[in-house]
Curated annotation (Swiss-Prot):
Entry similarity comment: Belongs to the ThiI family.
Domain (THUMP) ranges: 61-165
InterPro entries reported in the protein's UniProt record: Rossmann-like_a/b/a_fold (IPR014729), ThiI_AANH (IPR020536), ThiI_fer (IPR054173), ThiI_N (IPR049961), THUMP_dom (IPR004114), THUMP_ThiI (IPR049962), tRNA_STrfase (IPR003720), tRNA_sulfurtransferase_ThiI (IPR050102)
Disulfide links within the chain: none
Function: Catalyzes the ATP-dependent transfer of a sulfur to tRNA to produce 4-thiouridine in position 8 of tRNAs, which functions as a near-UV photosensor. Also catalyzes the transfer of sulfur to the sulfur carrier protein ThiS, forming ThiS-thiocarboxylate. This is a step in the synthesis of thiazole, in the thiamine biosynthesis pathway. The sulfur is donated as persulfide by IscS.
One GO location term (cellular component): cytosol
Swiss-Prot/TrEMBL catalytic activity: [ThiI sulfur-carrier protein]-S-sulfanyl-L-cysteine + a uridine in tRNA + 2 reduced [2Fe-2S]-[ferredoxin] + ATP + H(+) = [ThiI sulfur-carrier protein]-L-cysteine + a 4-thiouridine in tRNA + 2 oxidized [2Fe-2S]-[ferredoxin] + AMP + diphosphate; [ThiS sulfur-carrier protein]-C-terminal Gly-Gly-AMP + S-sulfanyl-L-cysteinyl-[cysteine desulfurase] + AH2 = [ThiS sulfur-carrier protein]-C-terminal-Gly-aminoethanethioate + L-cysteinyl-[cysteine desulfurase] + A + AMP + 2 H(+)
SUPFAM superfamilies linked to this entry: Adenine nucleotide alpha hydrolases-like, THUMP domain-like
Positions with a binding annotation for ATP: M183, L184, H208, F209, R265, G287, Q296
MF GO annotations: ATP binding; CCA tRNA nucleotidyltransferase activity; tRNA binding; tRNA-uracil-4 sulfurtransferase activity
Main localization category: cytoplasm
Protein name according to UniProt: Probable tRNA sulfurtransferase
Length: 407
């Protein structure tokens, strides 16, 4: 039986108090943006839930697929709407039951939001259950483990009936928690960190450090693709690509080999701080995981963080690597992240990097050269791309154009 509405249940935003309206409006805006390319949809946001009406032109399954990726949504149900007339409600439930197979079981769950409705909850359950039993054969009631749970919600504007629930992404609507700058390396961890922070309602812009010719265009393409995957959930994301070769070569000239990783990370943060101020972000996000590599011990983090007063958010800091890999697979970034193209964090890696850097030595090595101008130059020569879910590089566009000419 074809449905004509989608019921969207809110996630954590239901815990908000006087500012709930702000969160509901932000979620509504995000839903409208996500569905704008699909014909036949109309979004109506209310305080406790959202309804999306569908016409025959709407691709209902595609609408559901997009909604499940939007942060702030707990779940989605395809629903059928009718009036508060008892006969109409019975007819709708009986029509739904025609999809039940012989031997299957059901139960009726009634939620009577409109307390002015003349029948109480249990009486309505009995009426509807009886109507289904009378109109079908070899179908029975099981209130504990039914094959179908027929949910009926009686509201002021009508009665909604449904049997399916699709799990949403949860979290808070993106845009309600400010903006951060995600340090996107191209590995497994940083895209997951970006997804986790977006789930808290935070909008991201991404920054990537590119060191040609030591890092290839394939490494850059990989980061673009990771950004594209992240954008599927939130819309267009700006990716800032930093020319990092000059800085990285100079670090390797003047800093002791065991300390080059520490200094590299410090210079990255210095550049990121400049970009953060330009774009109006409030924090830096990275995929660091405590103890995973030499630069991610507590002493290393302390030495690296010294160059900035900006808050640094580490959503993955306490997770096991297996948990991070699992999340990467779930969000669709894992297969891209493991492509064998080196980024600037893996080139020039010392054989024996220091895990507990002496802070005084870090300062001593870096004082041999004034990095200020080089840091500013890197920040001034950034390439900024706006990536959405349909993004194609100039190379891909040229390829498409060539194919069109040939065929």
């Amino acid at each position: 039986m074809e449905f004509d509405h989608l019921l969207v249940r809110y996630g954590e935003l239901t815990l908000k108090g006087t500012n709930r309206k702000k969160f509901v409006n932000a979620l509504k805006d995000n839903v409208i943006k996500s569905l704008q390319t699909i014909e036949g949809t109309h979004v109506k946001g209310k305080r406790d839930r959202m309804y999306i009406s569908l016409t025959e032109e709407a691709d209902a399954q595609e609408v559901i697929n997009r909604l499940t990726k939007i942060f702030g949504i707990k779940s989605i149900s395809p629903v059928h709407k009718t009036s508060q007339e008892l006969d109409e409600i019975k007819k709708l439930c009986v029509d739904l039951a025609q999809d039940f197979k012989p031997g299957e079981t059901f139960k009726i769950d009634v939620k009577r939001v409109d307390k002015s409705f003349p029948m109480d909850t249990y009486a309505l359950q009995r009426e509807l259950g009886g109507a289904i039993l009378q109109a079908t054969e070899d179908i029975s009631v099981d209130v504990k483990q039914p094959d179908y749970n027929v949910r009926v919600e009686v509201r002021m504007d009508g009665v909604y009936v449904f049997t399916q629930i699709y799990e949403g992404a949860g979290g808070l609507p993106v845009g309600t928690g400010g903006k951060t700058l995600l340090m996107l390396s191209g590995g497994i961890d940083s895209p997951v960190a970006g997804m986790e922070i977006m789930k808290r309602g935070v909008y991201i812009e991404a920054i990537h450090f590119h060191s040609p010719p030591f890092t290839s265009e394939k490494a850059k393409d990989k980061v673009i693709e990771l950004t594209r995957i992240l954008s599927e959930r939130v819309g267009p994301i700006k990716l800032h690509i930093v020319p990092f070769t000059e800085l990285q070569k100079q670090i390797n000239k003047v800093v002791h080999p065991r300390y080059t990783m520490t200094s590299t990370r410090r210079m990255m943060l210095r550049v990121a701080d400049i970009v953060l101020e330009k774009v109006g972000a409030n924090a830096i996000v990275n995929g660091e995981n405590l103890g995973q590599v030499a630069s991610q011990t507590l002493k290393s983090m302390y030495a690296i963080n010294d160059v900035t007063s900006t808050p640094i958010l580490r959503p993955l800091v306490s997770l096991d690597k297996e948990d991070i890999v699992k999340k990467a697979r779930e969000i669709g970034t894992f297969d891209v992240s493991i492509q064998p193209y080196e980024d600037c964090c893996t080139i020039f890696t010392p054989k024996n990097p220091v895990t507990e850097p002496d802070f005084d030595k870090v300062i001593k090595y870096e004082s041999v050269f004034n990095f200020d101008e080089m840091v500013q130059r890197a920040a001034d020569n950034i390439e900024t791309l706006t990536i959405n879910k349909d993004y194609k590089s100039e190379k891909d566009q040229n390829t498409d154009a060539l194919i069109d000419e040939l065929f």
